[in-house]
Amino acid sequence: MAKRDYYEVLGVSRTASADELKKAYRTKAKELHPDRNADNPQAEAQFKEVNEAYDVLRDADKKAAYDRYGHAAFEGGMGGGARAGGGYGQQGDFASAFSDVFEDLFGDFMGGRGGAPRSRAQRGSDLRYNLRVTLDEAYRGVQKTINVPASVACDACKGTGAEGGAEAVTCPTCSGMGKVRAQQGFFTVERTCPTCNGMGQIVKNPCKVCHGAGRVEKERSLSVNIPAGVETGTRIRLAGEGEAGMRGGPSGDLYIFIEVREHALFQRDGVHLFCRVPVSIAAAALGGEVEVPTIDGGSSRVKIPAGSQTGKQMRLRGKGMPALRGGGAGDMLIELAVETPVNLTARQKELLREFEKLSEDNNPEGKSFFSKVKGFWDGMTG
């Protein structure tokens, strides 16, 4: 079977740039890779065809020979000047081309040429701590002491993992690269070194305290400043208070996530507070004053307008929560709840019945409601 044109295989024009060739190759190779096409028996042959085409067109000399002589340039019939370095059958050149692109596609799985070893010094992991505070503490701000279990640098070996603090030595398996290579079929696979776990170094005489880890588990007490205005979900970062680093690497950070407990009197909405205050029927009808508590521990007297109903809201400006990053404070919203009296005496019941007879014209909302009900039923029967 005649070979297809290499440009056709990659789906590019003959004037395609090196970047366009590489982009086309990456797309085709990713699409046709055998690992992703286990149920397609033709995928492997197409995959090899794509790699063969790119192996030629990525090389300036091979490309020039192909543009001039076509496939004949690599079939052995041309003179030495026409053969530009061999074709698909030369595994070294092909593996080089394959590795260049697949290093981008699969990261550490495919190794490029001249890859660097993993950094020997590793930063420690970040830690999370959930801290609950009261609404009063969130209002004022508070200093809290917390106990955090974490890995810290071993004092016996100064974090090196070696007995007596001796330095680690270069790993003999990977020669300090942290990776080892293996030939699989027509390409090279690069994996993390199993001896040093990618560190590039090993400890000959492990520390007896930390067993070569360079870290030990320990609970630490930390003092944390909780600023005024925090709310549930607020995150506080303590730099360098996370897990200890490896091989002299920096420690991670500790992130404290705040949860504000519910309050018996106040509900919170951002910087605003909400308080439901019960009032008597007499106070709601005649008007008056009610004393309401405030989050700062004090109280404020609030005037109740005559004729107030349940659900009426009044605002105390500046009596809410402080803004976390400055900018004043929110408000406190007071909602009235008109309270129905219970456990009435005979005299109280008598007075209420008399009051009801005298108040037919004093209940506009009820009058309006029953008028609407009458209209509804008239419409149903009419």
UniProtKB/Swiss-Prot annotation:
Residues 5-70 form the J domain. Zn(2+) 2 binds at C171, C174, C193, C196. The keyword Ligase does not apply. Keywords: Chaperone, Cytoplasm, DNA replication, Metal-binding, Repeat, Stress response, Zinc, Zinc-finger. CDD domains: DnaJ (cd06257), DnaJ_C (cd10747), DnaJ_zf (cd10719). A zinc finger (CR-type) spans 141-219. PROSITE patterns: DNAJ_1, DNAJ_2, ZF_CR. It is found in: Cytoplasm. Participates actively in the response to hyperosmotic and heat shock by preventing the aggregation of stress-denatured proteins and by disaggregating proteins, also in an autonomous, DnaK-independent fashion. Unfolded proteins bind initially to DnaJ; upon interaction with the DnaJ-bound protein, DnaK hydrolyzes its bound ATP, resulting in the formation of a stable complex. GrpE releases ADP from DnaK; ATP binding to DnaK triggers the release of the substrate protein, thus completing the reaction cycle. This is Chaperone protein DnaJ. It comes from Cereibacter sphaeroides (strain ATCC 17023 / DSM 158 / JCM 6121 / CCUG 31486 / LMG 2827 / NBRC 12203 / NCIMB 8253 / ATH 2.4.1.). The gene is dnaJ.
